[in-house]
């Protein structure tokens, strides 16, 4: 049995922003400002990758290119993409500054990890500027990871394993099976699998579900169960070793990998 040494969390949809609503709203607002409508599902399908890359992927979608050409009589340029990103970034920075809340059980899980001497780290699709504000606001609410990594710290963003590898090196961890990646997207699971670590997917707060806590509560039981089953299947297909409803279920999974001596230390 191998003790878990580090748990690496995603941010939006995992630690903050139940339903990962803010990035979707920011992407839609950026394209709406340019007169282009984008469906929420199309935005969410690549959720978790670095945000410049996400803008570029959205700009390459055939329906976006057709709408852009119809409006502007030309294709989308690099300058257009930069303008879209700048709008997106400012919108999201404002949301992070004013709307950041923790998802349920974050602080309880943090207490568990610290009590068991397990490192806490994060990876993200946020830029450093976004991460700085998210970390500051989450810190005011009591969440304090030891190490936070963005794509700007490494050669390649998610789903590449570079950010996780960076964290393992920083903590002198050599066995990836002593590391757990927790996230709410397909990209999170792929990142974890590419790094060879254990992966845990979240359902209730996830981008895949895409609902606020209030809307989740109002969801009919039959619909809820069907959606949960679909998300579980999606996360498992992406490489999730475990799929849980929310973070309150994480300690029970981690306990399976702790030696009795450490469990009762």
From Swiss-Prot:
It catalyses: phosphonoacetaldehyde + H2O = acetaldehyde + phosphate + H(+). Its cofactor is Mg(2+). It comes from the Bacteria. Mg(2+) binds at residues 10, 12, 184. Binds 1 Mg(2+) ion per subunit. It is an enzyme of class 3 (hydrolase). Keywords: Hydrolase, Magnesium, Metal-binding, Schiff base. Belongs to the HAD-like hydrolase superfamily. PhnX family. Involved in phosphonate degradation. PANTHER family: PHOSPHOGLYCOLATE PHOSPHATASE, PHOSPHONOACETALDEHYDE HYDROLASE. Homodimer. HAMAP family: PhnX. This is Phosphonoacetaldehyde hydrolase. The gene is phnX.
